[in-house]
Amino acid sequence: GDVYKRQDEEREEIYVVGSVFKIQVYSLSGNYKRTLNLPYDMSFEQVFDYDKDSLIFNDGREDVDNPVQKGTYYYLMSKTDGGMRPLPFHVKYRITNRFRIRLRNGDRQGVISCMFSVKPLLKNGDEVILSEFSNDTVFSYGKEGAKPLLVRTPAPRSTFPLKLMSVSACSRRFLFLDVIEKVYRRNIKKLDGDSFVYDYREKEIFTPVLVNSDFIPELPVEIDNMNGSFPKYAGASSIHSREFMQYYRRGNLQGRACEAASCLTRDDIYVLVLYHFN
């Protein structure tokens, strides 16, 4: 699986998620300090820095033969000793972002598995947005507990095929949503869904068009906050430095993008662009 890290500058620690079963903790200088282990019947799917004492994660373990499971999948984990505390969300009939198909050919059998790009957790500053695929309500969870953000209608299990919905970014007024049908299609390389925005003020849903006006002409933007910890009400996208410099040399950048390009070196690989929504 992928190796990724979370950093806590106040504790001067880095949390490396190199396995679905454990997190290794290092100092900022790279010295190993300790390991945080999961019980045998759990696995990490998403992990985020939550506060000075805790990480937050969801359990990715799935029993395809028993969809009615223990019902608790979201936890806070102590950064010190790995102790866990469940979040107050109970799921009876879980819907996951994974697809598994059992194939049989005579005496031989196998399993095809894939994972959809939508994910249930999103870090939003000091809060976490939880769009559990089985629930009809999207919540924001923080110091003051859970707060409902959006109620799905119709409910998830009343649609066929199932539609997985997650939050990709948010502002005080808008909630950015990704929706994808949970359908297996043969010989497809990428499973794309649809993007929508819910407007709290107008109480309407529409299809967004996001562009970066620092590019000439304006560059379409795809927000991807799923795997990072970003400031509240912000969105992130990335562009390869080589492509970014091509825009710069052709004179197709202006404003802060032009300033950023002038500072790049040959050691820079990707440029992270942070968008703040009003």
Residue ranges and their predicted role:
Residues 147-168, 200-232, 245:
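Conserved blade-ending motifs and adjacent loop-strand segments that build the rim/top face
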Residues 34-40, 83-93, 147-155, 205-212:
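Beta-propeller fold detector
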